[in-house]
Regions:
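Membrane-interfacial, low-structure loops and terminal tails that flank and connect transmembrane helices
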Residues: 1-9, 334-347, 658-663, 788-805, ...
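Membrane-interface segments at loop-to-transmembrane junctions
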Residues: 11-12, 45-49, 77-85, 337-345, ...
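Hydrophobic cores of alpha-helical transmembrane segments in multi-pass integral membrane proteins
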Residues: 15-34, 52-67, 84-98, 285, ...
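Internal alpha-helical transmembrane segments
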Residues: 20, 49-125, 297-346, 358-361
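Soluble non-transmembrane domains of integral membrane proteins
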Residues: 107-304, 359-627
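Internal mixed beta-strand/loop scaffold within catalytic domains of large alpha/beta enzymes
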Residues: 133-136, 141-148, 155-169, 186-188, ...
Length: 936
């Protein structure tokens, strides 16, 4: 009996079981992401996520979590903070289970002026209809991945046995993430057998097939089942807004009515992104639309697990804060240990604010070039273009633009423009934003961004033929018909006699869900955006420089000229004539007085009519200062060099058993502090300039990670921590400026305009800074382990200090990563009705949480070499973060999409990135024997 009790205690309440379970869970999730990448979402769900064994794994983890707390007598030891924090995980798992087993989700397709009282399920069913009346839906676990293990299904229909024997299931094509499949099965009913070939489309729609079984007609389909609602949704009107001068969607919305089944009106409602219809427990989200723009596709969700899940999220965040402040908690014990090691105490101060994020408005397409061009539709731009100037004349204008305008750009740079978001900004900012997006760099053939913008705007016919638009995809260049080895295309290259070459392709890509888009799809959208921007410059529709007395919206040249207000029309005509003629003359004679005076007069006019919208010159100059100072790129090398120098100084003193030179260390400390202050100033200015928090895209998140890293070094008050954090900040800024991240400020897509998203991204990216610091501290510890000798006793003290700093940084990083990930679930649930969808990005974030939770709990296994274990695992564990941040995008999200079964290309440098840390771990393991003293 005693042995049975011991066995149960081991299996249900032991860290020796809990930690391997966490590792197994993380491994299963990782494998599932690669299954999804190769075989589609349905395969990953059928093989991992929706399987009984995966459900059992969740339940087992839940039981072991509870059992471990009971066995460790946490309540008796007054570990209230730890109990509260881990209880939140229990509540989250229970909420997820309620959602998993009792929730419903799917899609509803509604055409204008029609109503629907049912929706298509997200899960796949065998739908059976007998004689067009009796219906039966059987949930199926079939996937092509394990087609050789298909089992017959036995059912009863109209009191007669029905046997469905699956023979084979296979994909219709080899494209990844395409779930279209064909199920071949034999149906036996009424003593008659027939073979069916059932087609399931990529949207999970089943195509029905029918056969006669004596006197009974049996119809089968393989796909979504129709779930009936106790009410109807009627689509009154679908609205699609497009970007100015473009066929590309900007936003879309559905004007609907909620009706009773007898068509009685309950209420009208407008559904759009982040604006959800809630009714009788069901939530309706804007998902997609029909190509003819006469129908909408709504995602439908009914989630009884939402309340316990949200409560669990709240408890988790409060519990994490409690653990950090608990005087008997691990975090403050480590802090006290550092004090005993003559290290400073730790202070965490992180302010997270979510600012205003404006929307992007639509604008009427125009074309403006003095009086020489007329308003045109973009698809017909080639047909109405003026006769080509000779190549020599174009080169002459480019030469004069390069040489003459260089010292006369200030008046243009300071000219205030209202962008499509409604924000007033200097033309200098517009030029940098647009030109970098188009060219993927800030200069072109000796011209800076402002010169390029002026050239495109004043001489559009010249620039239609210049190959300047960047594209990274050879397949797209092949479709356009340009040389494959030339990364740049001209505006005229994307048009032919039939119009815009990418029009149909753009429409097709927009119909796909984001996670189903491959490399070509994403590049199509990027190039389409660049084409839109070039057209916007050609037409001068971006040049909203004329304030309106009646509204806060400023007018573009054509809007002002065509304004019913005769005064505005007259003033605009005169200003434009003087600006265009003055610029043209200036390029010929190098005399700029006329155009500069006109721009000054225009600024005075703006100030008089825009009133409080007009920016003070100090604010305009601050924005221009930010544009040209280029804080972040210039900080890269100083961060790296200063971090390396400080590291060399500290390590050399440790090896020699001497005190580091005070003046050298202070100088390096002050230099890094100045870099951090400049970095902070740059972030504040970028926040001020952009109008939203500086972590809204990949580039800004890298800036924020770099900032969080160097701040972590300062608050930890350790020279080694500061050297590591400075080096890490430099590496993060280096990665941000490699060229594949867009540094310019752009409008946010509708789904990103969320308060919850700002919090989610800021917290989760800051966690990467702390976990990145753990990686560097782990490397330092391993190097010091390798350097250990009997006569270098001071190295042991340093290793213990680094180990304490490392663990504190990891605790902070894990808490922030966990809170940030689950806050992302709140954002997703409020945006499209699902707080967890096993998307590869969120799944790998969960894997990273599991990895670091496992690392921090390894000490409960009783190892005597905790500093070595922590150092090794903090280095190796960081690969999960790298996979989350970079690997998912490269291998799992379609940036490089390959046919199923194709090998994934692995860059050569990646082998070294993995081999070197492993080599350090192996070398350090020979001198691993070092224990952390008992903490009090």
């Amino acid at each position: 009996m005693k042995s049975l009790k011991s066995l149960l205690s081991f299996l249900l309440a032991s860290f020796w079981v809990a930690i391997p379970l966490i590792a197994l869970y993380a491994l299963a999730c990782a494998i599932a992401t690669f299954i999804e990448n190769d075989y589609g979402t349905s395969a990953s769900k059928a093989i991992v996520y929706n399987t009984p064994w995966f459900n059992f794994l969740h339940a087992y983890l839940l039981v072991v979590l509870i059992g471990t707390f009971i066995n460790s007598k946490a309540l008796e030891r007054k570990r209230y903070a730890s109990l509260f924090f881990h209880s939140s995980l229990i509540l989250i798992i229970l909420g997820a289970a309620i959602t998993r087993f009792f929730g419903t989700e799917g899609l509803m397709h509604v055409r204008e002026n029609s109503a629907q009282s049912s929706f298509e399920s997200a899960d796949t069913y065998l739908n059976i209809t007998l004689n067009d009346t009796t219906k039966l839906s059987l949930k199926t676990p079939f996937t092509f991945y394990h087609s050789k293990r298909l089992k017959p299904i036995h059912a009863t229909l109209d009191h007669k046995p029905l046997i469905l024997e699956p023979l084979e299931i296979y994909k219709q094509n080899a494209i990844k993430k395409d779930d279209a499949a064909i199920l071949v099965l034999k149906a036996t009913y009424n003593g008659v057998s027939h073979k069916f070939n059932l087609i399931k489309t990529n949207r999970n729609e089943g195509i029905e097939e029918s056969e006669m079984f004596k006197d009974d007609k049996l119809s089968l389909s393989f796909g979504s089942a129709y779930i009936e609602l106790p009410f109807q949704i009627k689509l009154k009107r679908f609205e699609l807004e497009r970007y100015a001068g473009s066929m590309s969607p900007s936003s879309y919305a559905s004007e609907v009515e909620v009706l009773k089944l007898d068509n009685t009106l309950i209420k009208p409602y407008r559904i759009f992104m982040n604006h959800v219809l809630d009714y009788e427990g069901y939530r309706f989200f804007q998902s997609s639309y029909d190509t003819d723009e006469k129908g909408t596709i709504l995602s439908v969700n009914k989630d009884p697990g939402k309340i316990p899940t949200y409560l669990g999220y709240a408890m988790l965040i409060l519990g994490a804060l409690w653990l950090l402040l608990d005087k008997n908690g691990r975090f403050l014990k480590l802090s006290r240990f550092l004090k005993s090691q003559q290290a400073a105490s730790f202070l965490l101060a992180l302010i997270l604010i979510s600012p205003f994020t404006p929307s992007f408005a639509s604008e009427t397409p125009i074309d403006m070039h003095g009086g020489k061009s007329a308003s045109i539709e973009r698809q017909n731009v080639e047909n109405s273009a003026n006769k080509e100037d000779s190549k020599s004349a174009i080169l002459e204008r480019l030469k004069h633009l390069r040489e003459y305008s260089k010292d006369h750009l200030k008046a243009f740079q300071r000219l205030q423009v209202q962008d499509f978001d409604g924000r007033i900004k200097p033309l200098d900012t517009i030029s940098i934003e647009y030109i970098h997006k188009i060219l993927k760099k800030d200069d072109f053939q000796g011209l800076n961004a402002m010169q390029v913008l002026l050239g495109i705007m004043f001489f559009p016919n010249d620039w239609r033929s210049i190959k300047m638009i960047y594209t990274s995809n050879k397949a797209l260049r092949k479709l356009i018909g340009t040389p494959l080895d030339e990364s740049r295309i001209a505006f005229r290259d994307v048009f032919d006699s039939r119009g815009y070459k990418l029009k149909n392709l753009v429409e097709e890509v927009n119909q796909k869900s984001p996670n189903a888009r491959n490399e070509l799809d994403k590049d199509v959208l990027k190039v389409d955006e660049r084409i839109n921007l070039v057209y916007t410059l050609f037409s001068a529709q971006f040049l909203r420089i004329f304030p309106s007395d009646k509204t806060t919206a400023w007018l573009s040249p054509v809007e002002a000229i065509n304004s019913p207000n005769k005064e505005i029309s007259s003033v605009a005509t005169e200003f434009l004539k003087n600006i265009f003629n003055g610029f043209d003359d200036a390029l010929k004679t190098n005399q700029w007085d006329k155009v500069e005076k006109t721009l000054k007069d225009l600024s005075i006019y703006q100030q008089e009519h825009a009133k409080n919208l007009y920016l003070p010159y100090s604010k305009v100059d601050s924005e221009i200062f930010l544009n040209h100072t280029n804080f972040f790129n210039r900080l890269t090398l100083p961060y790296i060099l200063l971090g390396l120098l400080l590291f060399i100084v500290v390590i050399s003193s440790l090896v020699k058993n001497t005190i580091p030179n005070v003046w050298i260390t202070k100088t390096l400390y002050v230099a890094i502090l100045l870099c951090a202050l400049a970095h902070s100033m740059g972030l504040v200015l970028r926040w001020y300039v952009s109008g939203h928090s500086p972590w809204s895209n990949a580039y800004e998140s890298m800036l924020y990670i770099a900032w969080a890293s160097v701040i972590a070094g300062f608050v930890l008050r350790s020279k080694l921590a500061l050297s590591a954090s400075s080096f890490l900040a430099g590496i993060a800024l280096f990665v941000a400026h490699l060229g594949f991240m867009d540094p310019q400020i752009g409008h946010l897509v509708p789904v990103l305009k969320s308060y919850w998203l700002n919090i989610h991204v800021s917290v989760i990216t800051a966690s990467y800074g702390f976990l990145g610091l753990c990686f560097v501290l782990g490397i330092l510890s391993l190097v010091l382990f390798i350097l250990r000798k009997e006569d270098r006793f001071n190295l042991d003290k340093t290793i213990l200090s680094i180990s304490a700093i490392n663990e504190m940084s990891m605790i902070l990083g894990l808490f922030m990563l966990t809170a940030g990930n689950f806050l992302g679930g709140v954002w997703a649930n409020e945006s499209w009705g699902r707080y967890w969808g096993w998307d590869p990005k969120e799944t790998w974030a969960l894997i990273s949480i599991c990895v670091y939770a496992l690392i921090l709990h390894l000490r409960f296994l009783g190892s005597q070499n905790w500093p070595f274990i922590l150092a090794s695992s903090s280095v190796l564990g960081f690969y999960s973060v790298l996979m989350t941040y970079f690997g998912v995008n490269y291998y799992l999200s379609g940036l490089h999409s390959y046919a199923a079964g194709d090998p994934l290309p692995i860059p050569t440098f990646l082998y070294f990135l993995v081999a070197i840390p492993f080599a350090l771990v192996i070398l350090a393991s020979f001198k691993r024997h070092l224990s952390l003293p008992k903490l009090v």
